[in-house]
Amino acid sequence: HIANKSKIYSGAEQYLCFEHDAKTGKPFLDDQGRMIARKGILKDAINCDFDSFAAECMETNNLYHKNKGTADIKSHDYILSFDPKDDITAMETMELAKKYAGKFLEGHQVIIVIHPDGHNGSGNIHAHIVANSVRKYPALKQKWHEKVREYKQGCKHKCTNAMLRSGKQWVMDECRNRGLNQVDLFRSKVREDYWVQKRGLEKDPDFMTDKDKLRIYVDAALPFATSMEHLAEILH
């Protein structure tokens, strides 16, 4: 999960749909100076139109007088990543992502983008679920909700420990029911340097460890980071 304070909602959309340099976060351009679309992605939206996500989020923010300050969290990015051995399709990944969003981000404007691969051809298909922090429609009260504002219309999404625990358990249960490989999301893991992991993948395509999760987090954080220091702050 990544909480984003940038008011430029279109930045996430552009990063998810167009090729970017993984180190700098800058878009790759063709000979005519145009951004290059990512290949093989699948995209969808909930409670909004994908192409007008940014404008619709700002409209909701203005309606409920939210997200006016620079320190306000504007959006949330949740990532579901799968083992290459699962051979899960983009459509199946989208189905799981939409179920997750419907359960844990109910009432929010959400865009979902499925990336068929990670860096260096690692093959780990993954879903980016980006939600406006302000809830456009009311949600049903769930067992992990601790306060009314966690499901009330016009209030902001709270990524609480209770919500994260329920979300992790849901993902593990879904993977288990579908016969997919999974990791214990409740087990502490040592995360080493991101680029060490990338070099390992370059030397050996089968190099897969727990650090793969960190690689996905960095991939999601890059469009929101303005500097390496800011990137470190987001990941922290």
Question: For each of these PLM feature ranges, what is it?
Answer:
Residues 1-236:
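N-terminal nicking endonuclease/strand-transfer module with a His-rich metal-binding environment
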